[in-house]
Amino acid sequence: MENRGIYYIDFGTQAQFIEEIEKMNSEYYFKNGKNKTYHIITYGCQMNVHDSEKLAGMLNAMGYVETQNLEEADLIIFNTCAVREHAESRVYGNIGPLKRLKDKKPELIIGVCGCMPQQLEVAQKLAKVFPFLDIIFGTKSLHKFPQLLYKAITTKKTVIDVAEDEDVVVEGIPTARREGVSAFVNIIYGCNNFCSYCIVPYVRGRERSRRPEEIIFEIQQLAANGVKEVTLLGQNVNSYGKDLPDGIPFYKLLEKVNAIEGIERIRFVTSHPKDLSDELIFAMRDLEKVCEHIHLPVQSGSTRILRQMNRHYTKEDYLRLVEKLKENIPDIAITTDIIVGFPGETEEDFEDTLDVVRKVEFDSAYTFIYSKRKGTKAAQMPNQVPDEVKHERFQRLVKLVEEIALKKNQQMLGKVCEILIDGYSKRNNLLEGRTRTNKVVNVKCSDEFMYKFVNVKILEASRHWLYGEVI
């Protein structure tokens, strides 16, 4: 018996729409001697990156071919993020100039999906401000993309689909992962925590876990296709299985993934501190494929502010967790998220945050200035912190975080570590890989090492990356 309100759907229901669009695109190819192309612009977290891989997989199945040139594309999709105002502003700024392209190419399909249009008022605003948009749909309608696209093509009208009540888990969506030997795998969707600053539960829905057998099957298929490293995704992976009848906890899922032949590294994001169990810490310690890295968002070091954020732990709780992690996994790298300028944050509260940063010595931190999100509890709170105070505190925090990150990376100098080379560096003529602790290492070596594990001696260190040579 399934949980009430959560529906398990097979993607096969979209087959007829995929077939119809593929037929249209085949006719286009025979008439014009070229394929129709698509271009996806992605904002936000790893969940969005993986959703874009699913969009690409569906488009490939419908006969489209990806292009890196937006101007040449026959279909453009913006996969959006709603966590911060800055991300939304970038989307509005990037859609506007496409009207010129749409006027030039009337058959061009332009769509907006993801977390922004999952908010009905935002979807309606997008349609009003940009009447040339063809498809607008939220996160809960991702699996219906072929159907929505077919409707937009055949009716020539803007299609809006924002499913507000239905929480679904859809299996079998085709996925076009980037080239390489690392892959993202969803294990749980949505969030039940309702942190007072966060829009995610409203745009991603309530927590709903994939069945363990579906996850294991997907990872087995990935391993059979040469994938060596998987990152298990969820807004809060520590909640995995709690909503399933006879579900297994997250640490048990890790044990199952650890047993899959061919998979050599396991990562996961994100972990909520309140749900980080001893069993999970012990699993990280004992399972040889689970990497020595955890992303554990602290958000604030002030117990008073954490209470206002609805985080359900104190400063002392967080520090005890970190101590336990370091006791059991001495080489663990800990990264985090920190918000500066939450409503009511005093200088004393901010000093508590700096104190946590000094005591934990995070390997890196994503630092954010508080961004008011409509519909969240924090947006209505009094004592909003003035912008100039937020920015001054932000600069102090970033300075401390980067000093510690540099110190931690310099401690790697002269050491030999294993990295999995998985692509080209942004620095010229270098390949790039990551250590088990998720540190980026640039290395000068031939392409024969691409997608392989190699031992590297660390020769240089900066705040954000290391440089080494193959030994």
UniProtKB/Swiss-Prot annotation:
Binding sites annotated in the UniProt record for [4Fe-4S] cluster 1: 45, 81, 115
Stored CDD domains: Radical_SAM
UniProt domain TRAM: residue ranges: 410-471
Assigned GO CC terms: cytosol
SMART domains: Elp3
Residues given in the record as [4Fe-4S] cluster 2 binding sites: 191, 195, 198
Compartments where found: Cytoplasm
Catalysed transformations (reactions): N(6)-dimethylallyladenosine(37) in tRNA + (sulfur carrier)-SH + AH2 + 2 S-adenosyl-L-methionine = 2-methylsulfanyl-N(6)-dimethylallyladenosine(37) in tRNA + (sulfur carrier)-H + 5'-deoxyadenosine + L-methionine + A + S-adenosyl-L-homocysteine + 2 H(+)
Keyword DNA repair set for record: no
Domain MTTase N-terminal: from-to ranges: 36-154
Pfam family, one: TRAM
Cofactor: [4Fe-4S] cluster
GO molecular function, one term: 4 iron, 4 sulfur cluster binding
Start and end residues of each Radical SAM core domain: 177-407
E.C. designation(s): 2.8.4.3
Cofactor binding summary note: Binds 2 [4Fe-4S] clusters. One cluster is coordinated with 3 cysteines and an exchangeable S-adenosyl-L-methionine.
Cited PANTHER family: CDK5 REGULATORY SUBUNIT-ASSOCIATED PROTEIN 1, MITOCHONDRIAL TRNA METHYLTHIOTRANSFERASE CDK5RAP1
Function according to Swiss-Prot or TrEMBL: Catalyzes the methylthiolation of N6-(dimethylallyl)adenosine (i(6)A), leading to the formation of 2-methylthio-N6-(dimethylallyl)adenosine (ms(2)i(6)A) at position 37 in tRNAs that read codons beginning with uridine.
Family per similarity comment: Belongs to the methylthiotransferase family. MiaB subfamily.
Protein known as: tRNA-2-methylthio-N(6)-dimethylallyladenosine synthase
Native source species: Caldicellulosiruptor saccharolyticus (strain ATCC 43494 / DSM 8903 / Tp8T 6331)
